[in-house]
Regions:
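N-terminal glycine-rich phosphate/pyrophosphate-binding loop and immediately adjacent elements
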Residues: 3-138, 459-461
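Mid-domain catalytic core of redox enzymes
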Residues: 252-376
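Rossmann-like flavin
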Residues: 98-204
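C-terminal segments that line or cap access tunnels to active or ligand-binding sites in enzymes
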Residues: 321-440
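Helical element adjacent to the flavin cofactor pocket in flavoenzyme catalytic cores
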Residues: 210-261, 265-267
Length: 511
């Protein structure tokens, strides 16, 4: 492997940072480019008045020794045991419905027992659902060991459940839930993590949802220092192997010659030559704008043009001079559903209208990382999130933030008050002693990360877009590879894997 081979990485979110680190580890001369002023994409935090806020990271699974995320970081020379802190093992997720609270615990067997105690008449259906979920967990672990080159004989056991699981690669999660129980409340509980993949149960691929849930089958973790801590660990790992980074470097075009990548051209005309280019931005941008149409099959161009993005978010970042643990929050995520109709919380995505009451997600980041890095002593940082239709903000998207005017500010404030009213109804008195109150709309996400339609999870994991119908690491252009949430899905682990896959493919590329 010649160390003189130049690799360029476009975008420095989790997938781009992982690509840079693995490519540098494999001996490439790496330069990672980001169009923004700061490295990290959704991992890049912002700070105000001593409070530090995450834009997109809430928890990570498979962080124990021998598990996927732990081993990926270890392979890069990062002490994963030091980086990650476990969330509450008895309830890393709390689902709060109108008259029912359910804490998601580890391991899967304990969570199944908890639900069986709550719903004793649904034992058979829970056995069916958790049988598939347990099979997905075994498949997840077997795939992880295979990817890491450490398969074991017992992985063959996971293969016995493949036929039963594979049918759910063609069927939505809602069908599995309805097949398992007719109890309205239990159906809502089994769909409680839907916000994590930003789709209602009727739209998300069943197997994709099962694998996501399985990723947290042995608990959930949060990085010390939040998203910024995770970003810094990846940056340091890449730089330790010689990788370099440039900000304010907007790639305008990926150049090719005879079907092979030759470099990129930046806004302003600067050309940077390369043997390998890994694009870790949305595939619709890479394949729809950066690569010449003549270099791609018509079918792939059409696919990139019609991809449905994941749902956009509206976030409220709160910094408060109070300890939220005294108000009932802990080292966990909280999902607040206004009813047992989980579908309703996502209806805005498809109707363009907001529901009467929002589904809310709470992330008390300063409790998840009690080191003091995210909030001053005696204070707390809190992220409050809901999903909104990007279409409601489209008329302002072409304008710079400073020029969006009072109508945009008024609509932004209206949604924030709608969310805070619901939060106060569910957690009376939680918000107070406020020092920082900032908002992030779908346009904020697009401004800061250039996410298509402000979507934080890349292409939606629907039946027509996930798995074999999704995008691949390899492209028809020799030397051009994809990484990021558009390859294996959103979240830390899929994006880390996308970087590993891009590096692996780059090593195999003809010189």
């Amino acid at each position: 492997m010649a160390s003189t081979r130049r690799a360029l990485v476009i975008g420095t979110g989790t997938g781009g940072l992982a690509s840079a680190a693995f490519l540098a580890k494999d001996g490439f001369d790496v330069l990672a480019l980001d169009a923004g002023a700061e490295i990290g994409g959704y991992l890049a935090p912002f700070s105000q008045d001593g409070f530090v806020f995450d834009q997109g990271l809430h928890y990570v699974g498979a962080c124990r020794p021998g598990q996927l995320v732990h081993e990926l970081f270890q392979s890069l020379g990062v002490d994963a045991g030091e980086l990650f802190r476990e969330l509450d093992p008895d309830g890393f997720d709390l689902y709060r419905f109108p008259d029912l609270d359910v804490q998601v615990c580890r391991p899967l067997a304990a969570y199944r027992e908890r639900l069986t105690a709550l719903f004793p008449e649904e034992t058979k259906g829970l056995r069916h659902f958790f049988g598939l979920l347990d099979g997905a967990a075994r498949m997840h672990d077997a795939l992880a060991r295979g990817i890491l080159g450490r398969p074991v004989l017992t992985d063959l056991v996971a293969l016995t459940g493949v036929p039963a699981l594979l049918q759910w690669s063609q069927r939505p999660l809602r069908e599995l839930i309805e097949q398992s129980t007719s109890d309205e409340r239990l159906r809502a509980v089994l769909a409680g993590q839907s916000g994590a993949w930003a789709l209602p149960p009727s739209r998300v691929v069943g197997l994709a949802a099962l694998l996501y849930m399985a990723h947290f089958s042995d608990g959930a973790f949060f990085p010390r220092g939040g998203g910024g801590g995770l970003r810094d660990a990846l940056v340091h790992a890449a730089e330790a192997k010689g990788a370099q980074f440039r900000t304010r470097a907007l790639v305008e075009r990926i150049e090719t010659e005879r079907g092979r990548v030759t470099g990129v051209v930046l806004a302003g005309g600067e050309r940077i030559e390369a043997d390998i280019v890994v694009s870790a931005v949305d595939p619709t941008i890479t394949l729809g704008r950066l690569v010449s149409a003549s270099d791609l099959p018509t079918s792939l161009r059409r696919k990139a043009a019609v991809i449905e993005p994941s749902m956009a978010t509206f976030q409220i970042w709160l910094g408060m001079r109070r300890d939220l643990r005294t108000y009932g929050l802990g080292a966990q995520n909280v999902w607040l559903y206004p009813s047992y109709d989980v579908e309703e919380g996502f209806s805005a995505r498809f109707t363009g209208k907001l529901p009467p009451r929002p589904m809310l997600f709470l992330s008390p980041t300063s409790i998840k990382d009690p080191s003091g890095a995210l909030a001053p002593e005696g204070s707390s940082s809190l992220v409050v999130l809901t999903y909104v239709p990007h279409a409601r903000f489209r008329k302002w998207q072409s304008l710079p933030e400073a020029e969006r005017g009072p109508a945009y500010a008024a609509y932004r404030d209206e949604i924030a008050q709608w969310m805070l009213k619901e939060l106060d109804a569910r957690y009376p008195g939680l918000v107070g002693d406020v020092v920082v109150q900032a908002y992030g709309t779908p346009l904020t996400a697009a401004d800061q990360t250039r996410a298509t339609a402000g979507a934080p999870f890349g292409p939606a994991m629907t039946l027509s877009q996930w798995g074999p119908k999704g995008f691949r690491t390899r492209t028809p252009v020799t030397g051009l590879y994809l990484a990021g949430s558009g390859v294996f899905g959103g979240g830390v682990a899929p994006c880390l894997l996308s970087g590993l896959a891009a590096s692996f493919m780059a090593k195999l590329a003809p010189k």
